[in-house]
Amino acid sequence: YCKVIEERAFFSYQDKSHIAVIKGVDSNYLAVSRLDTAVYFGDWIDYEVKQTVVVGSGISSILSVGAYDFMESLKIFVPKPGEGYISNPENAFESVQALPIGIYKLTEEIDKKFVYGNLSLAQELLNYKPDQITGLELKVRNPEEIKEVQRDLKEKLGQAFKVQTREQLNSVFYKMLNTENIASYLVFTLVLI
């Protein structure tokens, strides 16, 4: 399993900005998800250096950010929790600076949505305690047992927790793959005719 934190954030690089999700992951993440294989430029997160992140190709394009640019850091902002009126906008946000060391490419939607970083970076940004997270991601060894594991977790955790499979989390991605497979099948069928 892997501990994760996901939160919408405001990203700023030089004079450009974008709203996306910061996803803080611990060092077990690659045992659950082989996202490092999608990194086409640079490297995956360096867990020894808290301030490193990996951005999607869509975010890289929007912000004009590359990997290993030591001259400029990626600034990440989230609103400070609280209630009521904000008297000074400069004090309304928590922020950290990060160094993009890799760029990944999966789907257009995911590439514009997620920035992956060290779990401790996300905890610092959100003022979370070291044991505070927003989710756990599991890898089930036998894919045929996924529904059973999901049912057991829902039963044991109760209604306060959301238990989703990878397909449910990334439904758009899996629908796109199915559409591509159908389109490929139809094209090959037409070629054979």
Regions found by a protein language model. Name each.
Residues L30, I59-S60, A122:
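A generic structural signal for short hydrophobic patches within well-formed alpha-helices
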Residues D69-A160:
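Basic-flanked hydrophobic alpha-helices used for secretion and membrane insertion
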Residues R34, V55-F70:
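Short, solvent-exposed hinge/capping segments at secondary-structure junctions
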Residues N142-I193:
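Peri-transmembrane interface segments
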Residues Y1-K3, K162:
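Short beta-strand elements
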Residues Q51-T52, F114:
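A residue-level structural signature of the nucleotidyltransferase/glycosyltransferase Rossmann-like core
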Residues I5-E48, A92, Y116-L119:
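The feature marks short, hydrophobic/small-residue-biased sequence motifs that occur predominantly
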